[in-house]
Amino acid sequence: MVAKRIQKIREGVDPTKLYALTQAIGMVKERAIAKFDETIEVSMNLGVDPRHADQMVRGVVNLPNGTGRSVRVAVFARGAKADEAKAAGADIVGAEELVEIVQGGKIDFDRCIATPDMMPLVGRLGKVLGPRGMMPNPKVGTVTMDVKGAVEASKGGAVEFRVEKAGIVHAGIGKASFDAKALEENIRAFADAVIKAKPAGAKGNYVKRVAISSTMGPGVKIELASVTAPNA
């Protein structure tokens, strides 16, 4: 039964063909037939080797239509900044006591923000938060005094990205229930952010391949001209 379902959703998708973005979105949405609202993910193969510091690709993008998922945000802050975080809608706010909770292995959040003065404490959590991609970092706006703005961005559709060892960067950019236009706008916003994050050490073609897929569906390769600038 499962094999037949997999075969059915793969029908009509040629893994060797490149599709226009709008067509690819339609194909992915049609094949998102699971009993839950599948996440739509975009992946980009880049011409970089992240083992070299000058070829690291990292950044954050605010998707115009959000991600469709509820994001739990933790904020490490004291005093007025802690109050600001709570007022902005942060799910968990604390200082030393929150550090101890996380050190104990309880991570009940998806995104982590810290004020600069908290980083000596939060730095102790590198081994816990680092592997999960949650360590606050000023480069992606999660170490900041603008706590309100950071919390609202995280709740509203901010997506962090970081290239992996194989030169791939990927992210969930919406749900199958989104209309095609919303998904297209989110994909373009993500691709633009990745292109703008092109490192100085990147040589040759920067964007090599772009594909989208749903949680349970096949990947659909996209014509680069559909999503990237000519010089990408």
Curated annotation (Swiss-Prot):
Which GO molecular function terms does the record list? rRNA binding; structural constituent of ribosome; tRNA binding
The record's section on InterPro entries has: Ribosom_uL1_bac-type (IPR005878), Ribosomal_uL1 (IPR002143), Ribosomal_uL1-like (IPR023674), Ribosomal_uL1/biogenesis (IPR028364), Ribosomal_uL1_3-a/b-sand (IPR016095), Ribosomal_uL1_CS (IPR023673)
* Keyword Ribosomal protein in record: yes
Q: Which Gene3D superfamilies match?
A: 3.30.190.20, 3.40.50.790
Going by the entry's taxonomy, the superkingdom of the source organism is recorded as: Bacteria
One cellular-component annotation, GO: cytosolic large ribosomal subunit
Q: Which UniProt keywords apply?
A: Repressor, Ribonucleoprotein, Ribosomal protein, RNA-binding, rRNA-binding, Translation regulation, tRNA-binding
GO term, biological process aspect, one: regulation of translation
Q: What family is this?
A: Belongs to the universal ribosomal protein uL1 family.
Instruction: Say what the protein does.
Output: Binds directly to 23S rRNA. The L1 stalk is quite mobile in the ribosome, and is involved in E site tRNA release. Protein L1 is also a translational repressor protein, it controls the translation of the L11 operon by binding to its mRNA.
Q: Which NCBIfam families match?
A: rplA_bact
Q: How would you summarize the oligomeric state and partners of this protein?
A: Part of the 50S ribosomal subunit.
Protein name as catalogued: Large ribosomal subunit protein uL1
Where does this protein come from, organism-wise?
Rhizobium rhizogenes (strain K84 / ATCC BAA-868) (Agrobacterium radiobacter)
Classification lineage = Bacteria, Pseudomonadati, Pseudomonadota, Alphaproteobacteria, Hyphomicrobiales
